[in-house]
Amino acid sequence: MRVVLLGPPGAGKGTQAQRLAEKLGIPQISTGELFRRNIEKDTKLGHEAKKYLDAGDLVPADLTNQLVDDRLNKSDTVDGFILDGYPRSLEQAKALHEMLERRGTDIDAVLEFRVSQAVVLERLKGRGRADDTDDVVINRMNIYRDETASLLEYYSSELKTIDAIGTMDEVFARALHALGK
């Protein structure tokens, strides 16, 4: 099963991605982890990504796409994967479709974890990170909303919306149900 997880910061995507990956026996693929791993291994792509990250810039889409494409070449993705944090734009979604089309497959499901701005603020404040101020979080939520509007339309036939308010177990059960598991 090939699954994309969408949701604003603080929606619990990372937690649910990890749990779903364990339950389904497929890898969780996070772009943040891909950046870190490639930087640690000092790969060519990691070296390129590091330049942007060190400057505080976003890693360009084409470089992120290359990192994801390389990761999808690994044998553990043959039976599926959970993508967490990718794609973030329509351009990346189309690139992902091309990557999978070359492999004779496509996305099976897209889960959007929905949560209110008030809940996100409460959750992120609980993390205790200095950059989780109300203004920063609201800005990140607005960016997410603006970026993903076109993604939700693009994935409309595979999209399932998950109520991400509740305990981790409740949200996990909803996600499994949405996947027919």
Swiss-Prot record:
Primary enzyme class: transferase
Listed InterPro entries: Adenyl_kin_sub, Adenylat/UMP-CMP_kin, Adenylat_kinase_CS, P-loop_NTPase
Pathway: Purine metabolism; AMP biosynthesis via salvage pathway; AMP from ADP: step 1/1
Lineage: superkingdom: Bacteria
GO cellular component: cytoplasm
Binding site for ATP: 10-15, 127, 166
EC number: 2.7.4.3
Binding site for AMP: 31, 36, 57-59, 85-88, 92, 129, 140
Biological processes annotated in GO: AMP salvage
UniProt keyword annotations, A-Z: ATP-binding, Cytoplasm, Kinase, Nucleotide biosynthesis, Nucleotide-binding, Transferase
Pfam families xref list: ADK
Subunit structure: Monomer.
Domain notes: Consists of three domains, a large central CORE domain and two small peripheral domains, NMPbind and LID, which undergo movements during catalysis. The LID domain closes over the site of phosphoryl transfer upon ATP binding. Assembling and dissambling the active center during each catalytic cycle provides an effective means to prevent ATP hydrolysis.
Name of the protein this chain belongs to: Adenylate kinase
